Amino acid sequence: MNTNPIGANKTNETANNTWNENSAAEWFAKKEWKNGLLLEPHETTNKIIFAEQYHKNKTAWDKAFKFLGGNLEAKEPGKYEIDGDDVYAIITDQPSKEPEMAKWEAHEKFIDIQYVIKGEEKIGITPLSTATVSKPYDEANDYANYEAEGKSYTAKPGTFFLFFPDDVHRPNILVKGFEVVKKVVIKVRVAE
């Protein structure tokens, strides 16, 4: 019998929304959320926000990670519905951009899971608090562009990136020798 009034999938910790650096790191390290996913999250993942979002909408995240763990190399470029309008994926197979052509962006309604299926690219990351809006938020397309300085990381098969609304990111930056990159961006609606 379920005596937890919040629900069987919620722990007291998550029901009380008391995630902190230690509790989130402990939960993250257990990797139960991966459900067998062989890929690894990038070191830049905000564990507190991820723990909060995952526990607010476990079903959506589990579906997203199931898709991410599938045979993505066999999928054609295009949009894939995963869970209605709340979780979907876009697979691209296209040239990367010179750094000056890649734009800083952030989203309000959706969290990005970005994963390079084939090839390599650089991705810039910086906190929203350090960026200046260069193109105001476009609600229909859920993005704003920014002027920013940030740290760049190499994205390649085996590791995925998570970008929350406070993460300004600049994907699709060219790595010499990998001019064309196949990647997936899975959009997971932000849980309130």
PLM features: what roles do these ranges have?
Residues 109-113, 121, 151, 159, ...:
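Generic beta-strand structural signal
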Residues 1-19:
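Bacterial Sec-dependent N-terminal signal peptides
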Residues 73-135:
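Mid-length scaffold segments of soluble, non-membrane domains
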Residues 160-162, 178-192:
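A short hydrophobic beta-strand segment most commonly corresponding to one strand
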Residues 154-172:
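Conserved metal-binding segment of the jelly-roll/cupin
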Residues 173-177:
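Short proline/glycine-enriched turn/loop segments at secondary-structure junctions
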Residues 11, 21-91, 101:
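A short, N-terminal "cap"/entry segment at the start of jelly-roll beta-barrel domains
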Residues 121-155:
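A short beta-strand-loop-beta hairpin characteristic of the jelly-roll/cupin
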